[in-house]
């Protein structure tokens, strides 16, 4: 069984709802979230600070999950967040584990 890493780039307005979905998802083995700056993407109207800086405030979420759960996890996210500006990409998890 291979693991994948789903990276989500979400606007601040949907951050809590996305994190809640992942907390309740049996498909999300472990995930992290961190504030980040998004370049080249528009999450609706930039505020004045974002216009001056040339970047939008966002949250990056990375989720480790089994490749067999990919379709179900993405379908659930797409169902709840269609049209919100949430972006994603999936990469292979070459190796993951806990340092014991």
Predicted regions and their residues:
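Positively charged, small/polar-rich N-terminal and surface patches that mediate targeting and assembly
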Residues: 1-100
């Amino acid at each position: 069984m291979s693991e994948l890493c789903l990276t989500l780039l979400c606007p601040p307005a949907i951050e809590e709802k996305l994190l809640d979905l992942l907390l309740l998802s049996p498909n999300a083995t472990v995930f992290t979230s961190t504030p980040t700056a998004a370049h080249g993407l528009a999450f609706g109207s930039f505020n004045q600070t974002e216009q001056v800086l040339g970047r939008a405030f966002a949250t990056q979420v990375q989720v480790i999950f089994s490749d067999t759960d990919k379709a179900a996890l993405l379908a659930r996210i797409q169902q709840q967040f269609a049209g919100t500006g949430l972006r994603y990409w999936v990469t292979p998890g070459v190796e993951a584990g806990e340092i014991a």
